Structures are given as structure tokens and as C-alpha cells.
Swiss-Prot record:
Primary location class: mitochondrion
Pfam families with a match to the protein in the record: Ribosomal_L16 (PF00252)
One GO BP annotation of this record: mitochondrial translation
Family statement drawn from the similarity comment of this UniProt entry: Belongs to the universal ribosomal protein uL16 family.
UniProt entry keywords in alphabetical sequence: Mitochondrion, Ribonucleoprotein, Ribosomal protein
Entry-linked SUPFAM superfamilies: Ribosomal protein L16p/L10e (SSF54686)
GN (gene name): RPL16
Source organism phylogeny: Eukaryota, Viridiplantae, Streptophyta, Embryophyta, Tracheophyta
Keyword Ribosomal protein on entry: yes
Name used for this protein in its record: Large ribosomal subunit protein uL16m
Organism: Arabidopsis thaliana
Gene3D superfamilies, alphabetized: Ribosomal protein L10e/L16
Amino acid sequence: MYLTIKSIMLLWKYLLVTESQVSKCGFHIVKKKGDVLYPKRTKYSKYRKGRCSRGCKPDGTKLGFGRYGIKSCKAGRLSYRAIEAARRAIIGHFHRAMSGQFRRNGKIWVRVFADLPITGKPTEVRMGRGKGNPTGWIARVSTGQILFEMDGVSLANARQAATLAAHKLCLSTKFVQWS
């Protein structure tokens, strides 16, 4: 398990933790609204759309925490709602399939974080008069990036949970296993 300095800094910056840990610790970078994690402050309130890199970046393409994972096959954008829906699908499947065993041994890591605000103008508004207000958050995903990692579960359960989560995501994904 090899982590670069950049990936360690990103994990520290975005504090990839569960909702209960966020509410207990009161971190400065991550804020909780319902069950959704998003940055508390950004340098600018509005960003440009930008382009998703088509090439595969070496950072974040290997499993770093769990035994199984979900990897993106294409570059694109993931909304904070899609990330949360996929996370809930994985947890829901594990709770149904394994009952109390998942609570004792199972663990999930979310390796993507929606940190870019998306803006939108209200309907029936004329052109001009500046950029719209922030309406949501997205994460840019590159080809081959690990989205979720799982550990403490069987291969069959992990594969089925990855299939359920893939239906919630707007990117094509594949199931990977640590070797």
C-alpha cells in the first residue's frame, strides 16, 4: 500500500471520515448538511467549469485502505448527491446481507470529495447580469481513480454492493480487488 505525499495531503485536507466523526470533532474544512459532506470554506465562491482530464493520473489509482474497490473507467464529474446515493447503496446492501457482522468488521472509505461549487441561474431569467448562485457541489474524477473502498466483507457481497453503487453513479465503473 503506497501513498504519495499528495494523496496523504488530500486525505488530511478533506478528512475522509463518516458523518458521526465529523459531528463529534467539529472540523474546520468539512461541513455536514444532512448526510452530505462539503467544504466549509473555499477560496472563491464560484469556479469555472474546467475540463476533466482524459488521461490516467498515477495518484489515487491503487487501493490504499480496503481490500475491494470501485474504480472509474472514464473521466467525468460526480455530484455530491450521486456520491452519497452510492455510499448509501453500499451500506444498505451490507446491512441487509450481513446484519451485525458488517457493524463489527466492515468498513467503507469514500475516496472522492465534492469540492467544486456548481452554479445555476433560476428559470425564466434573462441572459447577462453575472454568474448564477451556487446550487450544489461536484467532484472531478479522472480515468482510473478509485471512488470507494471496502474491507471486512466477503468478495461476493463486495461485488454485489459495487454493482448497486455503479447504478447510482453517472460514470462507467469497474470492481477492483487488492492483489
